[in-house]
Amino acid sequence: MKILVIGGMHGNEMLGIDLVKSLQENPLENIDSVLANEEAIKINKRFVEQDLNRSFPGVKSSDIYEQQRPIELLKMCKEYDIVLDFHNTFCPDNDCTFVGEGANEELLGASWLLGLPRVIVADYDCINKYALNCVSIEISVQSRLNDVKIWRQKLQMLAEKEIADCQATSEVEKFRFVYRMTLEDKTRLNLDQANLIAFQQIDQSLAEKMGVKNPAYPIFINDKFTPYNYGGLLNKIDK
């Protein structure tokens, strides 16, 4: 299959950046790569003026780079069977993937083949909402998967398959992103004392106080990459 690898959607998340540089220096067959936000990469910041991955589908008439760039990226995505968009998190045990609502079912199979059986459906203005062939890959900086060599091997394996080989499996856990916990929530509910652990069910009363259906599962708690919010909450999607 034909694959596009995106790195540097956020300019300070190094796995994707280093992976793209590796692929550009030593290409793999049927795999192209692109750095999404080169301006943010230059200054080692998440973004310059606004978060690129909250700016899709973009604004053609804008003079802001991070509003124009989504249009170019979405056009590129149409040329590939699967797009893999790489991200990092400081939170341990948060390795997972994101897809858009209505995404190709093959993306679930691809996630499993890549060793990432937790898949989250997101409907905010990220690339996945508009490129339904895109899997965003989140890897903890502490994870053994935070390694360019490992991903080159995984990419080569995936590129040798046909898209039809990426069949969904019952081993995939599917979640929906339903709530973004704010810093106000952190203070109001004393969340630092709640012992929230990624993908482990939170207390029912706590979920109710945030207006979220139970059972709810936290993710990206107190991530240094996103200090302006506290984390997210997920609901599990029945198989």
Residue ranges with predicted function:
Residues M1-K239:
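Structured catalytic-domain cores with a bias toward divalent-metal coordination
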